[in-house]
Structure formats: structure tokens, C-alpha cells
């Protein structure tokens, strides 16, 4: 009974699970079930969101991988273009095409590749590309878009025409092969400009410095205003005839004049070097092109900075004009000072350290200091082109002498190679851009007016200035030289880089497209016709620059030398006695040139090698007198002889020592016998970079 009773008592408990007395126990169970159900449903939703996130991540990875492959293909295209250009140059070394140069052929290669990319290869645009319209008063540089609670950042690419809204994303590869303009200014231009200064032929450059400065400064300004005025007339005509679809002001015309006033006769100079054209003509063209690029870029910056007072920012204002002139002078002088200062700092570092014992570090420091000049000037609001140009000249004059022999060869070859690759890359890219740039604006009236303007602007530059310069020059600039300089006004890398730097507006797009056509025409027609023009103008070729004065009477040679050197005689003495000993290991010790009160400073700043040089020159505390015998100095493959005082040549040499010393330094660097009074100064380890030209475009300093 007990067991039965025990079982009965348990029975109601089992029945009570579903009975009325146990209903309060069901509520927690229902709650538990509900929580489990909704939790399971939420888990399903969460897994769906995770799946979508994973799908988006996979899509992003695929897009990144596809973009990487496409970028690699684009770079491969340019590498193949450069390879083809190098092979073409090698072929032209053996068989020259009379009316075609390598640079023109590089542009043709770029045109063919651009044509294939434009019409032969179609990369479908992303289906997610959407065109959104919104009313804003200005174009923001950065745009944040909220997509389902996620914010995405978009950057401004530039203005496009309304009829191209549906074609912007038509070909992804065309957008990929169009580089950011800053790539040209920060990567490609610095080695080209630096090499121009580093390989400058100083003797011929300084002998014609007055004429070069006149052509570069006055001539570029004249050309800019002539072209700007003519183009303003064309723009006015276009407005009257309804051909102008956007704003185009007089300041835009002046900016276009500054852009196309930048000459780059790289093709002509290469042919001049191969044919050994008259050195005076070569010096005038090369010097003008070197400084002309610097003047053109500073002039364009000054025009952009032109801001008259009042609401209309495009009216003429005298105050704003003088302000722009002040900006021009300030930017140019500041850039010049910054470039020279960087060269001086590099010279001091290489002099007072023992980096020459570690050639790799020495070359690396030289390279980085030289390149940083461009970026430093741009960061401070100056012009990097001017800064890096004068940095190259300063480095060649001072720093080069402090480098070890191996580093001297390395720096010469490094910048020669970079210059060669950068120039050919730009010419190939020019041809490519004609088809890959998607915002071209071609107007026949503007194009024809531009061609007429550049010819008239070049003529207004060369002929009037040559007439004025001949009034004060002993060696006149002949009419055949003037015609050749007029013909050699090619446009190239600098004009292209200035034009492509800003293509955000309708006016800038038209200027860029027209500049591209001008570059093509001048390189192909004028560059290809250089040889024929030399023959037509009867300009002598096969001239050895080192033998140019053979056959000239001695009295005329001395007179010409004195006239060409008197402006620089004071600078030469200051440089030889103070700057060279301070910045290099050469020259007389500062202890002998500075006043006695500066003795401690002079001893601190004088290189020990300078004392060694002085000890080699001393002979029992007496100056070395060149009277009792002959002395010969062998340097490389040449020998310099000094005969007895009764010989006529040494008498001439002694009689005009200051002018001769200056001319010889500008000619041979400082590996020479420099006679100052009766002391024989023999600078040691002091040379200028005599470059072995690889690309026939920039050449060794004399």
C-alpha cells in the first residue's frame, strides 16, 4: 500500500503538468521558446548579413586584383615603348633617316599605341557606375556619399562636357594610362632640368651670357605677350561667330602664350651635336632653351597670380600688373637662391665629411639632395624648375670636385640615364595622350591662330633682339644664325607639362589640345628639317669646339677674350680665392687669402688637402719662377708645357693671365696651370664633370 500510495501521490504531479494548477509554470517555458525562436531568426538574419559582407569583400578583392593587373599592363605598355625607342635610336646610329629624328619616331610609337587603346581594345565599364545630379554652387574637391549607412569618399577628377556624360566610363584603360600631371612635375622634370645645369658647357655659356639672358628673359616675355594678344583676337572672333562654348579671358590667352613660349629644341641640339655645328650657335640655342624653360614656368605662375581688385578678376589693373611682376621677380630670385643654397650645403657636407670613403652613400646623398631641391622649392611656393637648374650648375662647379672618382662617374651616368629615360618617356606619352585624353577640345580657328601666333612671337623674339645685341657684340650674330634660331624654336616637354598640369576648365582643355598639336608639328617638321636647313643657310659643321680659335690672330683673340671676360673677372677672383677654397678642396688656402684677423676661422674652414697642395707648390719658401727651364704637366692624354720666358707663347700667357685663367677654367675646369703673378697654382682633385653623352641631347661641359 505504501508503494501504491506513493505512486498515486506521484500521479497527480504528472497529470498536473497539463492541468490547471500548473499553468503558471508554462509562462517561463513560452518565454524561453519565444526567445529561442527569435534568437534563431536573428541568427539567420545575421548570417545573411555576414554572407553579404563576405560577398562584398570578395567583389572588392576581385576588383583590386583586376585593377592591379590593369595597372601592370599599363606600365608594361610604357616600358615596351621605351624599349622600342632605344632600339630605334640604336638603328639610327647606323642608318640615319634624313627627315626623321628619334624623338619624332617616339611620338609616332605613342600615337600608334594610343590609337589601338582607343579603338582596338574595349574594357567594359563597371555596372555600378552611376551618374548623380545635385545642385551645388561650387565643385568640391572631396565628396562623401552615404550608401546604406556607409560613407564613401570621392575626389574631383575635373570638368567634362555635357555631351560626354555617357562616355566618361566607356573605357577604363584610357583613364588608367592618363597620368596625374603632378607625376610630370615631381618625377619626370627634375632629372631633365638638373642634367641641363649639371652638364652645362660653361665656357660657351658664359661667353654668350648677355645674349642668352636677353633671349631668355626679354625674348620670352615678348613672345608671351605677342602670342597672348594674337590669341585674344582669335578668341574674340570665336565669340562673335559663336564658336566658343565656355569662358576664355585675356589672362587665359597670356597663360597660353607663356606655355607655348617654352622652347625645347632637344631634337635640333642632338643633331647639332652629331654634326658639330658652330659652337656659338649651339651655345646660344642651348643656353636660351635652358633658361627659357625656367622663365616660362615662372611667367605662367605670375599670370595665374594676377588678381585685380574688384568684382571682375579679369579686367586690366595697373596695381595687379606690377604685383605680378613683383611675384615673378620674387619667385625667380627665391628659386635661384634656394637652388644655389642646396648646392652649397651639399658641397660643404661632402667636403667636411669622409663620405668619399663610402661611394654608395656619397652617391645616394648627392642624388637625394639634388632631387630634394625641386620638392623643397615647390613646397615653399617657389618654382622647382629654376631651383633644380641652378642647383645642377652649383653642384657641377663645387660639389663635383669633392666627390670620389667613382662617385663622379656614378652621378654623371645616373643623371644622364634618368634624363634620357624621362625625355623619351614624355615624347612617347605625348603621342599616347592624343587618343587617351578624354577631354580634348579642338577648335580650327584657335588652332590656326595659335600656329600663326607662335611663328610671329618667335620672330618678334629673335630678330629685334639680335639687331640690338649686334650693336654691342664684337662677334655678330649673323643672319643665317638668326634664321636658324627662328627655325629651331621647337616646343617639347616643358610646354606639354605646363599645359597638362591643369585641364579642369574648358579654356585649359582647349589650350592643352592645341599645345599638343603644336608640339607634334614643330618636332616632326622643324626637327626633321634641321639638317636641310643647316645646308640651306650655309652654316658650318664639323667644328671642334676646342680648336675654334685656331687660325685667329693673337691680338684679336686677346681683345675678344678681354671683352668677354671683364664682366666676370671680379667674380672669378672672388670665386677662386674664397668660394672654391671654402666649398672644395682646391684653390689657395683661406689662410693666405683671408685677412690675418680671420686666421682661426680660415684654419677651421681650410681643407687639409689645400695645405698639401700649397706644400707641393713651395720651393724653399720662394715662389716658383718660370724663367730657368721648362715645366710640363701631363693630365689625361694632354700635356701643358711652359717654356722659358724668352718664348713668345709664355710671354703672351703671362701678359694676360687673368683673362687666360678665366677662359681656361671655363674651358677645362680646374685641371690646369693657373699662373697668378709669379706663383704657379696647381689645384688638385678639382674638376668639372666631363660627361660622356648617352643621348646626344645634353652634352659635357667644356
UniProtKB/Swiss-Prot annotation:
The chain crosses the membrane at residues 72-92, 104-124, 177-197, 212-232, 253-273, 279-299, 325-345, 373-393, 415-435, 437-457, 480-500, 516-536. One of its GO terms (biological process) is synapse organization. Its main location: membrane. One of its GO terms (molecular function) is potassium:proton antiporter activity. One of its GO terms (cellular component) is mitochondrion. InterPro entries: Cation/H_exchanger_CPA1, Cation/H_exchanger_TM, NaH_exchanger, NHE-6/7/9. It is found in: Endosome membrane; Recycling endosome membrane; Early endosome membrane; Late endosome membrane. Disruption phenotype: The SLC9A6 null mice show a 10-20% increased mortality after birth, yet the surviving mice do not display any obvious difference. Behavioral tests reveal a modest motor hyperactivity associated with coordination deficits and limited ataxia. Neurons from these deficient mice exhibit endosomal hyperacidification, as well as impoverished neuronal arborization and attendant circuit dysfunction. Homodimer. Interacts with RACK1; regulates the distribution of SLC9A6 between endosomes and the plasma membrane. Belongs to the monovalent cation:proton antiporter 1 (CPA1) transporter (TC 2.A.36) family. Endosomal Na(+), K(+)/H(+) antiporter. Mediates the electroneutral exchange of endosomal luminal H(+) for a cytosolic Na(+) or K(+). By facilitating proton efflux, SLC9A6 counteracts the acidity generated by vacuolar (V)-ATPase, thereby limiting luminal acidification. Responsible for alkalizing and maintaining the endosomal pH, and consequently in, e.g., endosome maturation and trafficking of recycling endosomal cargo. Plays a critical role during neurodevelopment by regulating synaptic development and plasticity. This is Sodium/hydrogen exchanger 6. It comes from Mus musculus.
Amino acid at each position: 500500500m505504501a508503494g501504491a500510495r506513493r505512486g498515486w501521490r506521484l500521479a497527480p504531479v504528472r497529470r498536473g503538468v497539463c492541468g490547471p494548477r500548473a499553468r503558471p509554470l508554462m509562462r517561463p517555458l513560452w518565454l524561453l521558446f519565444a526567445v529561442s525562436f527569435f534568437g534563431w531568426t536573428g541568427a539567420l538574419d545575421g548570417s545573411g548579413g555576414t554572407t553579404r559582407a563576405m560577398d562584398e569583400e570578395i567583389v572588392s578583392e576581385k576588383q583590386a586584383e583586376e585593377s592591379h593587373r590593369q595597372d601592370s599592363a599599363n606600365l608594361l605598355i610604357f616600358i615596351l615603348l621605351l624599349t622600342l625607342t632605344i632600339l630605334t635610336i640604336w638603328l639610327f646610329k647606323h642608318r640615319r633617316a634624313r627627315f626623321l629624328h628619334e624623338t619624332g619616331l617616339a611620338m609616332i610609337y605613342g600615337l600608334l599605341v594610343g590609337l589601338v587603346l582607343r579603338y582596338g581594345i574595349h574594357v567594359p565599364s563597371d555596372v555600378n557606375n552611376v551618374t548623380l545630379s545635385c545642385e551645388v554652387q561650387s565643385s568640391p574637391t572631396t565628396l562623401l556619399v552615404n550608401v546604406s549607412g556607409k560613407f564613401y569618399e570621392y575626389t574631383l577628377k575635373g570638368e567634362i562636357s555635357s555631351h560626354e556624360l555617357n562616355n566618361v566610363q566607356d573605357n577604363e584603360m584610357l583613364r588608367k594610362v592618363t597620368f596625374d600631371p603632378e607625376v610630370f612635375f615631381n618625377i619626370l622634370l627634375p632629372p631633365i632640368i638638373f642634367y641641363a645645369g649639371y652638364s652645362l658647357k660653361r665656357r660657351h655659356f658664359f661667353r654668350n651670357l648677355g645674349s642668352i639672358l636677353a633671349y631668355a628673359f626679354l625674348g620670352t616675355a615678348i613672345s608671351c605677350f605677342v602670342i597672348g594678344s594674337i590669341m585674344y583676337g582669335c578668341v574674340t572672333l570665336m565669340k562673335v561667330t559663336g564658336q566658343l562654348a565656355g569662358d576664355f579671358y585675356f589672362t587665359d590667352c597670356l597663360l597660353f602664350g607663356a606655355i607655348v613660349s617654352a622652347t625645347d629644341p632637344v631634337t635640333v641640339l642632338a643633331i647639332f651635336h652629331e654634326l658639330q655645328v658652330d659652337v656659338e650657335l649651339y651655345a646660344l640655342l642651348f643656353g636660351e632653351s635652358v633658361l627659357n624653360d625656367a622663365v616660362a614656368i615662372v611667367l605662367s605662375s605670375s599670370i595665374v597670380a594676377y588678381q585685380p581688385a574688384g568684382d571682375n578678376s579679369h579686367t586690366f589693373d595697373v596695381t595687379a600688373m606690377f604685383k605680378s611682376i613683383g611675384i615673378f621677380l620674387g619667385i625667380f630670385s627665391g628659386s635661384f637662391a634656394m637652388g644655389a643654397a642646396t648646392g652649397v650645403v651639399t658641397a660643404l657636407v661632402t667636403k667636411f665629411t669622409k663620405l668619399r670613403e663610402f661611394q654608395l652613400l656619397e652617391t645616394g646623398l648627392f642624388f637625394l639632395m639634388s632631387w630634394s631641391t625641386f620638392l623643397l622649392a615647390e613646397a615653399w611656393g617657389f618654382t622647382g624648375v629654376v631651383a633644380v637648374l641652378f642647383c645642377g650648375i652649383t653642384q657641377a662647379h663645387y660639389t663635383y670636385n669633392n666627390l670620389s672618382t667613382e662617385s663622379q662617374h656614378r652621378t654623371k651616368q645616373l643623371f644622364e640615364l634618368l634624363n634620357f629615360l624621362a625625355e623619351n618617356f614624355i615624347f612617347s606619352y605625348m603621342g599616347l595622350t592624343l587618343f587617351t585624353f578624354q577631354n580634348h577640345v579642338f577648335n580650327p580657328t584657335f588652332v590656326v591662330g595659335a600656329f600663326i601666333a607662335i611663328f610671329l612671337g618667335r620672330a618678334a623674339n629673335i630678330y629685334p633682339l639680335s639687331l640690338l645685341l649686334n650693336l654691342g657684340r664684337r662677334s655678330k650674330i649673323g643672319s643665317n644664325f638668326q634664321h636658324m634660331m627662328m627655325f629651331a624654336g621647337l616646343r617639347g616637354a616643358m610646354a606639354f607639362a605646363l599645359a597638362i598640369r591643369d585641364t579642369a576648365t574648358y579654356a585649359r582643355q582647349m589650350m592643352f589640345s592645341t599645345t599638343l598639336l603644336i608640339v607634334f608639328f614643330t618636332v616632326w617638321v622643324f626637327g626633321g628639317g634641321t639638317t636641310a636647313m643647316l645646308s640651306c643657310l650655309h652654316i658650318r659643321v664639323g667644328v671642334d669646339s676646342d680648336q675654334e680659335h685656331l687660325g685667329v690672330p693673337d691680338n684679336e683673340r686677346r681683345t675678344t677674350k678681354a671683352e668677354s671676360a671683364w664682366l666676370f673677372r671680379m667674380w672669378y677672383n672672388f670665386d677662386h680665392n674664397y668660394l672654391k677654397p671654402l666649398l672644395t678642396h682646391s684653390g689657395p688656402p683661406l689662410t693666405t687669402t683671408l685677412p690675418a684677423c680671420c686666421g682661426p676661422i680660415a684654419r677651421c674652414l681650410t681643407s687639409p688637402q689645400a695645405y698639401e697642395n700649397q706644400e707641393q707648390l713651395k720651393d724653399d719658401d720662394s715662389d716658383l719662377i718660370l724663367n730657368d727651364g721648362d715645366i710640363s704637366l701631363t693630365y689625361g692624354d694632354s700635356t701643358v708645357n711652359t717654356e722659358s720666358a724668352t718664348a713668345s707663347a709664355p710671354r703672351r700667357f703671362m701678359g694676360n693671365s687673368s683673362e687666360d685663367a678665366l677662359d681656361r677654367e671655363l674651358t677645362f675646369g680646374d685641371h690646369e696651370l693657373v699662373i697668378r703673378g709669379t706663383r704657379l697654382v696647381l689645384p688638385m682633385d678639382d674638376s668639372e664633370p666631363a660627361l660622356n653623352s648617352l643621348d646626344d641631347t645634353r652634352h659635357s661641359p667644356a
